[in-house]
A protein has these predicted regions:
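Alpha-helical transmembrane segments and their membrane-interface boundaries
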Residues: 1-283, 291-334
Length: 334
């Protein structure tokens, strides 16, 4: 069990905090029977900032607060921009190109910095799945901000009441931007994958098509071994998770039972990402299906589409990895 889930004090606190805050926003969705998806974005903001906090869970409360707030504002802006430029293929591709090189050149940096950039880019990609005008884009970013800030506030309150020893020195940071050959090839390869995925999503006007570039973003690592592991875990976790998520999405109609499942899967999703990517994806698949079900979206159709788009994203990454190996060989001969 310890191979798949982390149940140390810091992890449990993050999992419980995320469950409480996401539970609060989603219970409002249930009780008030809201017909909009703004509550979903508040829950999403909470969830993503919780994932970011995983990488800084052993730092001081002060550092986690400052780093968390900075990250929150950046990711809220990113999701707003993604929503606004979601149908603008050229602008969206240029922004993804910029993110690709930021991710590529900071991949060898400190996890706080590298993961922060990665999750901000992830929020931009998620935003592209919700086409909106200026007003709605701002509202999407605002509710994301509210949900994330609520998480940080609750987390800080809990941490101040519980004594936890800091394992890391806050003064030590390894923020490096390395435009070497390996990082450049990785950035170019990642940008190619993201742009292809984004093109497929926008050109064919696919509902939740953003899942294709998002899959590329999350499984494409700087080296083949890590990418292969991420591909395997992503595929297996999504397939097994879908076997549970799809029947739940079809047959469950009681909003309160759906909410309870969402509450539980939130906790396990946060605790699993620390230990095992595959188990994280398994619980994430169920989490997403239940979250969308509460937002009056088709959890079944989206879960099935998500499985298909995950496979497409994996095929894109695998193809580019094979091609980039040949490019790397040619460049090293020059």
């Amino acid at each position: 069990m310890s191979k798949y889930i982390c149940l140390k004090k810091n992890s449990i606190i993050l999992g419980i905090t995320a469950s409480l805050v996401i539970g609060f926003f989603t219970v409002l969705q249930v009780v008030l029977d809201l017909q909009n998806i703004y509550g979903l974005f508040a829950a999403l903001g909470c969830f993503v900032v919780a994932l970011h906090q995983v990488s800084i869970r052993n730092h001081s409360i002060k550092f986690r607060l400052y780093a968390g707030v900075l990250f929150i504002f950046c990711m809220s802006i990113a999701i707003s921009l993604g929503s606004y430029y979601s149908h603008d293929l050229i602008t969206s591709s240029l922004i993804l190109l910029g993110f690709s090189f930021l991710i590529g050149y900071t991949a060898k940096s400190d996890l706080v910095f590298a993961n922060g950039i990665l999750f901000i880019a992830d929020m931009y990609v998620i935003g592209t799945g919700f086409n909106a005008d200026v007003t709605d884009s701002i509202l999407i970013g605002l509710f994301t901000l509210i949900g994330a800030l609520a998480f940080i506030i609750v987390l800080v309150v809990i941490l101040k009441k519980i004594s936890i020893k800091n394992a890391f020195d806050d003064n030590y940071r390894s923020i490096r931007i390395l435009p070497d050959i390996d990082s450049t090839i990785y950035a170019i390869s990642l940008s190619l994958g993201l742009i292809i995925g984004n093109f497929i999503s926008i050109y064919f006007d696919i509902e939740i098509g953003y899942w294709i570039p998002m899959t590329v973003l999350l499984i494409f690592k700087p080296d083949v071994i890590r990418s292969s592991t991420a591909i395997k875990h992503r595929l297996i976790g999504t397939v097994i998770g879908s076997l549970f998520a799809i029947p739940l999405a079809i047959y469950l109609s009681n909003a309160y039972i759906i909410w309870m499942i969402l509450f539980i899967t939130t906790f396990f999703t946060i605790c699993c990402i620390i230990k095992h990517y595959g188990s994280y994806v398994f619980f994430l698949t169920i989490f997403i299906a239940m979250l969308l079900k509460l937002a009056h979206l088709s959890g079944y159709e989206i879960s099935l589409s998500r499985l298909i788009y995950t496979v497409i994203g994996i095929v894109i990454v695998a193809t580019i990895i094979i091609l980039s190996k040949n490019i790397r060989t040619i460049l090293k001969r020059i």
